[in-house]
């Protein structure tokens, strides 16, 4: 491949055309996954009858079924939906199940004394949740959520199976004009690595900050 071909593949096809779609897919899916995870995590953490069991089955399905099959199933069901919207929904459902377990674990880790104190003060359950419990959960769960975002970013490549024009699909199409698979997919690998590595570093710094500055300060005050 000539230098001009490298420019076309990297800048014109991947960076200018495919990367914006991929970033929109990441943003949409992460927001959707966080909403599913937060609502479901609260229900699971509070052990709401029936709903908690239903969500437990949903989590097990998402854990036990390959991501690609989830997207292909939604693609077959939502015949009038765009590939982008189906990809956002599918990835949101998949990642939301994992975030749900993170939030659930955070809620269950909150000291029972705080629940009892809130009950003694006759605080409504929604006040207890959103003023006392959820802020603590989000603080502790933030590094784990960053880690889940890294997995979500890597998982967006599965959207290529339903024709969503993210980076992997664009690279597959580019192969028809540029036969050097090592270069084309190598550029995709580099872009994904940069995004995931940057978030991994951020997650480690956040985890260190939470442990040293926030949790550490609380223990000192106690």
Label the model's feature ranges:
Residues 1-222:
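Transmembrane alpha-helices and adjacent helix-loop boundaries
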